[in-house]
């Protein structure tokens, strides 16, 4: 992925670290804020209240997620820790401290090595990342080592551990295969639209196994691959597992492939050469990572978080505290459908801990707009579940973030089963690249269209079709855009709407 050079990021982070409003405790590098400072910092314009963002500075690709020693560890080459993936403690702004000058630390992952396969000790956390050498026009894979529970990492003198002389060879994900007692790396051969598989006994010496691709959407690039097993949630194979390969494509979307891995090659099922199956239908979900469970404590549950932005415009967004934020955590599973395997994504259940008192509405839609009262006071920090009857021909939907003549429009047509999300009218700033619509075919379930919606200060996530289609969008609505409306072409459609105010995770 195209990144800001590491020395630029380092300078920005170090400058931010010198700001007088924050202090660091020796040894743990944990930032401490007074309640007044926290109130000021986390009430900046556009600051989301329950989507994670760094206190200050750049945050883009998730760079290694793991569950270990009873905590979720979340990296963007800063680091935050969490016990529930709802509340976060930012413990380091820059985990790599001694990378040679001129080398950029690009996307990668972090693993725990309790069996000491690498020889750095059984307490070691090891980051596997891409070194970008702009002068040599070369990308290679390297490792760094932590002995303070993953908060700071030291450069390995034997780097790079994998260098094939490519300019675009990046974004490793590394997992432990217990069956073979080997490490497996998936890494992108970006401009070839391929993912390469390598194996190693010690994270230092890597042997090529196979390449996957080109496949699916291959217009410009493959990058940021992730590889994991998922349980099937229905049908005759319910409870069994398949391998899933997720690849970020063309700097603005993700696609996935489902199949089997024989220890050497990944064999995708139902492979289509020219079209991919998308992880998310919105423009702002990219470079997602799943949490690798080194405690063996998650009972097979797989959680994912993605970067909610887009390389087409991310550097130009009007955020005062930095650039970028992450999605809500999603629990993943697989579903067997008439169209093949489909990824199911549902908000992590612990998010319900943020809910306040529910407000409930029901009735029949009238032709035109119906303003939902009392929602504007929630300030675009809420969760909603809405269902519409689909038995009669109609076009209806919701207007979110309504105010000052602007809104996010969600429209459904019962005849075509088309759901369209239009954000061309929502942002309170002008940027042509941001003016986008997205859509998908959404089949009714038991005669109902059901949408599970998360609205935050500058983004919206919409889960539809029981989690098989998700729309993630940045919105950047103005402070007065807090209204919610229902609308309908014809009258008579039954609806139910439940809304919960959500507490800020920063308090």
State each model region's role:
Residues 238, 251-252, 262-287, 291-507:
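Beta-rich accessory regions
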Residues 14-16, 21, 164, 400, ...:
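Generic detector of low-complexity/intrinsically disordered segments
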Residues 24-171, 176-222, 231-281, 299-300, ...:
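Beta-rich carbohydrate-recognition and catalytic domains
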């Amino acid at each position: 992925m195209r990144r800001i050079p590491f020395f630029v990021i380092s300078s920005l982070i170090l400058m931010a670290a010198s700001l007088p409003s924050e202090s660091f405790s020796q040894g743990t590098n944990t930032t401490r804020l007074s309640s007044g400072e926290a109130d000021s910092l986390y009430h900046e314009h556009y600051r989301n209240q329950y989507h994670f963002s760094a206190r200050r500075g750049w945050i883009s690709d998730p760079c290694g997620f793991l569950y270990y020693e009873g905590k979720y560890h979340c990296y963007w080459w800063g680091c935050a820790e969490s016990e529930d993936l709802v509340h976060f403690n930012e413990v380091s702004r820059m985990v790599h401290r001694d990378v040679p000058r001129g080398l950029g630390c690009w996307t990668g992952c972090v693993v725990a090595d309790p069996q000491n396969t690498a020889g750095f000790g059984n307490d070691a956390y090891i980051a596997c990342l891409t070194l970008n050498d702009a002068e040599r026009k070369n990308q290679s894979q390297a490792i760094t080592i932590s002995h303070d529970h993953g908060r700071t990492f030291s450069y390995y003198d034997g780097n790079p551990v994998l260098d094939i002389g490519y300019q675009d060879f990046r974004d490793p994900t590394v997992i432990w295969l217990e069956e073979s007692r080997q490490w497996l790396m998936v890494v992108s051969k970006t401009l070839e639209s391929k993912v390469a598989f390598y194996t190693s006994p010690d994270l230092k010496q890597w042997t090529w196994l196979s390449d996957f691709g080109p496949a699916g959407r291959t217009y410009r690039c493959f990058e940021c691959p992730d590889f994991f097993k998922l349980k099937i949630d229905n049908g005759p194979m319910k409870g069994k597992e398949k391998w899933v390969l997720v690849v970020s494509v063309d700097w603005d979307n993700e696609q996935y492939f489902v199949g089997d891995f024989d220890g050497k090659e990944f064999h995708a099922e139902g492979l289509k050469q020219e079209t991919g199956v998308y992880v998310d239908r919105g423009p702002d979900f990219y470079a997602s990572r799943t949490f690798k469970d080194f405690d063996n404590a998650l009972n097979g549950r797989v959680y994912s978080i993605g970067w909610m932005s887009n390389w087409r415009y991310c550097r130009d967004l009007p955020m005062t505290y930095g650039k970028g934020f992450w999605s809500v955590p999603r629990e993943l599973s697989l579903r067997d459908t008439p169209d093949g395997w489909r990824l199911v994504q549902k908000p992590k259940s612990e998010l319900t801990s943020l809910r306040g008192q529910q407000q409930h509405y029901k009735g029949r839609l009238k032709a035109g707009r119906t303003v939902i009262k009392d929602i504007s006071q929630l300030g675009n920090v809420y969760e909603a579940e809405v269902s519409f009857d689909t038995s009669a021909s109609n076009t209806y939907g919701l207007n979110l973030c309504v105010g000052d003549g602007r809104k996010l429009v969600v429209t459904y047509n019962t005849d075509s089963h088309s759901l369209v999300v239009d954000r061309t009218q929502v942002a309170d700033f002008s940027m042509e690249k941001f003016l986008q619509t997205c859509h998908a075919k959404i089949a009714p379930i038991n005669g109902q269209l059901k949408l599970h919606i998360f609205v935050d200060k500058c983004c919206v996530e919409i889960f539809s079709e029981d989690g098989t289609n998700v729309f993630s969008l940045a919105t950047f609505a103005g402070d007065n855009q807090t209204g919610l409306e229902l609308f309908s072409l014809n009258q008579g459609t039954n609806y139910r709407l439940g809304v919960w105010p959500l507490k800020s995770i920063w308090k």
